[in-house]
Amino acid sequence: MKKSKVADLIVQHVQKQLFMALSDAIYAASKRSYDYAQKKKLDHRATALGYDRHLNLNETIYEVFEANGCNPGKLRGNRIVEGHSGIFTIVRESYNDNQWKRLFRSKRKQELIAENVSVEKVVQPDLFSDGSDVPKATLFVVCRFSGSLQNHPEAPMTVQL
């Protein structure tokens, strides 16, 4: 098995219990949102699920960040919830199978992605850098939902880093 320098960076700077807590929080918030949406009229159910999922995930992940000393930014509306662990800024992103193209379009997400330029050099060093120095980076926890009320709507189909 090939050793991953990026995985080593993550293990070095992010505690395992933070990942476990994030995973539990994502599934719990998703289930809570699904249960809430089931009480709505059928015509509003998909919209209610999406809105409530967004709010529940933000609130629950914010609580996980607080409990794990990740200094989350202020919880407010559509703002991205960010936590910090070592060199990493950790954020959650969700998308439905039918909306993947819009995943990282916001200005703030573009700024967070730009922080990973030094991680690119770890993966593929250039002539002027060996890629050993990574001052800061962003770790996206990406939740992929089905986008359907009939196919696995109560939880993410996958959660990836």
Regions found by a protein language model. Give the residues of each.
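Interdomain/boundary linker segments immediately adjacent to catalytic/signaling cores
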Residues: 1-51
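Solvent-exposed interaction surfaces and binding hotspots enriched for charged
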Residues: 3, 85-86, 103, 128
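N-terminal short leaders/motifs
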Residues: 27-40, 89-104
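Localized chelating/binding microdomains
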Residues: 39, 84-90, 157-161
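A short acidic/basic microdomain associated with nuclease active sites
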Residues: 47, 65-91
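Nuclease catalytic cores
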Residues: 50, 54, 58
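A recognition module on extended beta-rich or small alphabeta surfaces enriched in W/G with H and D/E
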Residues: 91-159
